[in-house]
Amino acid sequence: MLKDRMVRAKLRKSFREQRPISYVGKVTAFNDYWVVLAGKMVMVCRNQSKGVQVDAKPANYVIPRDGIESIAVLPDTFDINEIEVMTDGQQFKMIVKNGTDCFLGELGEG
């Protein structure tokens, strides 16, 4: 279903002080328990000038399905090397050309 699609997977927060984390990339494997993604991690951080920290190099991530809060399907043309983030009021959003912008977290989090 999601295999070979570009997605943004936002993880659940286990406790209030936890930083919001999302993974952006191509799904390489998908089953009832795991999602395997080849992409980059995006984390909301107060100490960063842009408000978010993006991995410099792509990597493979194995994410448990019950740890995922939401999955947004991105256009196949989305380039993970050109991730742009904007602020919309109190929210950090990832800019998606030819698609809907994705929520990453809020200003006070992280």
Q: In which residue ranges do the predicted regions lie?
A:
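Conserved RNA-binding domains used in RNP assembly and mRNA/RNA metabolism
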Residues: M1-G110
